[in-house]
Regions:
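Core SAM-dependent methyltransferase catalytic element
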Residues: 181-206
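A short acidic, Gly/Pro-enriched loop at the edge of an enzyme's catalytic core
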Residues: 89-104
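A short glycine-rich, Lys/Arg-flanked "PGG" loop and its adjoining helix->strand segment in the class I
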Residues: 117-129
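Class I SAM-dependent methyltransferase SAM/SAH-binding core
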Residues: 41-93
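Conserved beta-strand signature within the Rossmann-like core of class I S-adenosyl-L-methionine
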Residues: 130-138
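Conserved class I S-adenosyl-L-methionine
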Residues: 1-37, 49-50, 67-72, 149-152, ...
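Short alpha-helix
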Residues: 161-177
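A short SAM/SAH-binding and catalytic strip from SAM-dependent methyltransferases
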Residues: 102-115
Length: 206
């Protein structure tokens, strides 16, 4: 997506997401962030919709590579209940030493990274042994929905900052040496059917 496209997407993102955020999606974010412990990294923090949900963690680092999103995120830093550091970095190339974090969080991010396999390898690298990767991601459905997701994947990505409809993040975790501890497949409403289902899970660094 072009720089102009990123600016426009950042400008409308919160408004576009508001109906879902005020419903089940907001509750799912609460659940995901409730798993965060110790030193925490959130990849693809976007406009900061999770920020106010963090409590009782030792350290919080928010990674966001898109400048217009970071500017929106900066406007929410006053909502934080814990010390926060914001870093300009993509999920595929994190500027942290190995074994730096107890928890890595990803909510609606891995659908749009350029290389989800590389991103998950980085997640595993920066997690301490026994650390947790907590995620809420949408992606590949089944049956007729999967057919339509494949048909619409390219045009959808073109207008939604590279968001893909066909990824199954949970299926990529074992290759990254992340062992699934909990996984639920969900259909929160109101959410467009084309982006369903969502997968909420916890995986442990092997």
């Amino acid at each position: 997506m072009s720089a102009l496209g990123h600016r426009l997407f950042a400008a409308v993102y919160d408004t576009m997401m508001a109906p879902s955020e005020q419903g089940a999606l907001g509750e799912l974010r609460d659940e995901v962030i409730g798993h965060a412990r110790g030193d925490v990294l959130e990849i693809g923090a976007g406009t900061g919709l999770n920020l106010r949900r963090y409590e009782g963690v030792e350290r919080l680092v928010l990674s966001e590579p898109i400048a217009p999103m970071r500017r929106r995120l900066a406007g929410r830093l006053g909502d934080a209940r814990v010390p926060v550091e914001v870093v300009d970095a993509p999920a595929e190339d994190l500027p942290f030493a190995d074994a730096s974090f107890d928890t890595v969080v990803s909510t609606l991010v891995l659908c749009s990274v350029a290389d989800p396999v590389a991103a998950l390898a980085e997640v595993r690298r920066v997690l301490r042994p026994g650390g947790r990767f907590v995620f809420l991601e949408h992606g590949a459905g089944e049956g007729s929905r999967a057919v339509w997701q494949h048909r619409l994947d390219r045009p959808w990505a073109a207008v939604s900052a590279g968001c893909h409809l066909t990824r199954d993040v949970a299926a990529l975790l074992p290759a990254a040496r992340l062992t699934i501890e909990e996984l639920r497949v969900l259909e929160p409403h109101p959410t467009p059917a084309i982006v369903l289902p969502f997968r909420l899970g916890v995986a442990v660094a092997a």
